[in-house]
A protein has these predicted regions:
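Metal-dependent de-N-acetylase/amidase catalytic core
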Residues: 2-4, 86, 92-269
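Active-site rim/loop-helix segments in enzyme catalytic domains that contact anionic ligands
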Residues: 1-108, 142, 236, 248, ...
Length: 269
């Protein structure tokens, strides 16, 4: 049986900075890995305002960066929803859900990964695309739900949230002062670690972290957002990346219990 993994994120770089090692590992093992990206990152500029290439051009730059990244990670497919960076939470929810359902039914993944309810650090785009994806998983399995291409229903076996555990956050916190976390509705948002006991799945992908680092560096326009981490030695960065690979199993139709998984496809035959 072909194993298919679909990731659904908001911006170019979410995939590699969040789970690049995991994606590289599964691609190397022959899993078909796919990415649905909600936007093209048109507002993600971290340089001087004078050097800003502008809304449309930056979107083109980041699209090319993401295309280079998914090639580095060995991913099979890349698909854009073409919402505007920063406005994903304003998208028509029915339309967004239908778009994702169409991709789910076409790709037929056993496993989907998206953002947790807090969007990892409160970014409204992250939160929105996570909510849309949760709804799309339900709708994709409903034979009475008609998507944009009228495809047959598909039931996803497992849905995961990409999360950051306490150990990882404690390691990177000293570098976070230089990172820009969003202010939303007058409130400063930021990274909140998942307690280690909450993590249901830990993927050992350390040997693939140099691939993940090359993929991250494809997002050249975004490297300033990493602050001091971007200037660390490669071995130090890959050691940090190796502490990712932590996920929360939001639901599974095939397994459960407290035993920590070492594979997103545990129970799938």
């Amino acid at each position: 049986m072909n194993r298919n993994l679909l990731t659904v994120f908001a911006h170019p770089d979410d995939e590699s900075m969040g789970m690049g090692g995991t994606l590289a590992k599964y691609a190397a093992e022959g899993v078909e890995t796919h990415l649905v990206c909600a936007s093209r990152g048109e507002r993600g500029w971290f340089g001087s305002e004078e050097a800003n290439p502008g809304f449309e051009r930056l979107g083109q730059i980041r699209t090319q960066e993401l295309e280079n990244c998914v090639k580095e990670l060995g991913m099979r497919g890349l698909y854009f929803l073409d919402y505007i960076d920063g406005d994903v939470d304003q998208a028509d929810h029915a339309e967004a859900i239908s778009k994702i359902v169409t991709h789910i039914r076409r790709i037929q993944p056993q496993v989907i990964v998206t953002f947790p309810p807090d969007g990892n650090y409160g970014h409204p785009d992250h939160i929105a695309i996570g909510q849309f994806t949760n709804a799309a998983v339900v709708c994709a399995a409903d034979s009475s739900y008609q998507d944009l291409e009228d495809l047959p229903s598909h039931r996803v076996s497992k849905l995961y949230y990409m999360v950051d555990g306490e150990n990882y956050i404690n390691l990177v916190t000293p570098f976070m002062d230089e990172m820009d976390f969003p202010i939303v509705d007058g409130q400063q948002r930021g990274e909140v670690a998942w307690m280690e006991w909450m993590i249901t799945t830990r993927i050992d992908m350390a040997e693939h972290c140099h691939t993940a680092l090359r993929a991250i560096r494809c997002h050249e326009s975004q490297l300033p957002s990493l602050g001091a981490i971007a200037n660390m030695h490669d071995d130090a960065i890959t050691a940090v990346l190796a502490m990712q690979g932590t996920f929360y199993r939001a639901f599974s139709l095939i397994n459960g219990g407290r035993e920590v998984e070492s594979d997103l496809f545990t129970g799938i035959r």
